[in-house]
Amino acid sequence: WRVIHTGSGHLGLEVAKYYQELAYKQLKDINALKMHEPHIPKSLCYVSGQAFKDYIHDMEIVQKYAELNRKYIADTVIEKMGWHICEEFQTIHNYIDTKNLILRKGSVSARDGEKLIIPINMRDGSLICVGKGNPDWNYSAPHGAGRILSRSEAKDAVGIDEFRESMKGIYSSSVMESTIDESPMVYKPMD
């Protein structure tokens, strides 16, 4: 198996931030019409109506971009290596299943019989799994075990030497200061 783990290259975050700002502005406009303005954090504001439809539309474009990006990377590597594809599939995480309106943050689709990948960390690899289709879990599975440290905490707590030591025996061109926030020790262990 060869796994390509990449997303939209920051584009999804920019689209989400745009609509979060729009939601906050709409809330402020509504509150300006009222006497009492309750404080609602920006992160809890949401869009509705046409803005919601526009957001879903734009996120579909971002998700298609990420899918095509992974496909291009895979096709290029396969061609250059002279490999033959026996089977391929994509698993995406931190996205909106726009067909079923399921937000998957930290999870992946796991419909009954669906093949999926659950990445553990850069050292321990990924699990190739088959979905169970559990409606109580929104037909989802976890995207890995989760973080122990946030990205900023990891940069303060983990040194490059510790990172390199944890990756001994694993080939990677990505063990560097700028990827400390992805080092194995910032994630929960598999067990």
Predicted regions, residues:
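Domain-length cofactor-binding catalytic modules of enzymes
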Residues: 1-191
